[in-house]
């Protein structure tokens, strides 16, 4: 899980150092201007890297737009590969809360679950079907991989 804070400026709030640091580090208005005409989804990053030996999927840092709000992840995130043969979906869920009436808090959370349903405040990162004894990959090596139905992100 990761969290973004953005200050709320309104009458009566005292401007403090933390608010200025968040404003400097997270220029939200720039995102809103640059990507206002983009649909919800991944804007940059969130690449998938598989580590076969450790059986881990790494999601790289990135920026996403969910419900016309922006959320960014500053560090890579790792998820264990499921061992049970099923259809899986990896999605990013965003929640928006107001903390102490001083900051907007946007929290992003990765969810790996069976099936293929997406609800409000979520975007799909990838879908895959696992098979026991096969390696999970994220690249196409030849034309036969285009027909491959399982273990490919």
Regions found by a protein language model. Give the residues of each.
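Beta-strand-rich solenoidal segments
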Residues: 4-9, 56-153
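N-terminal "first-domain core" detector
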Residues: 2-59
């Amino acid at each position: 899980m990761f969290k973004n804070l953005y200050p709320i400026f309104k009458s009566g709030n005292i401007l403090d150092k933390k608010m200025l640091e968040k404003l400097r580090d997270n220029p939200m208005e720039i995102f809103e201007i640059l990507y206002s005409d983009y649909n919800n989804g991944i804007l940059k990053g969130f690449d998938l890297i598989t580590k076969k030996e450790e059986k881990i999927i790494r999601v790289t840092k990135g920026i996403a737009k969910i419900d016309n709000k922006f959320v960014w992840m500053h560090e890579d995130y790792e998820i264990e590969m499921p061992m049970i043969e099923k259809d899986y979906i990896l999605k990013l869920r965003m929640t928006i809360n107001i903390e102490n009436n001083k900051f907007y808090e946007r929290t992003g959370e990765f969810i790996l679950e069976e099936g293929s349903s997406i609800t409000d405040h979520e975007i799909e990162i990838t879908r895959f079907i696992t098979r026991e004894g096969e390696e999970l990959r994220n690249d196409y090596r030849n034309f036969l991989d285009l027909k491959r139905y399982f273990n490919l992100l």
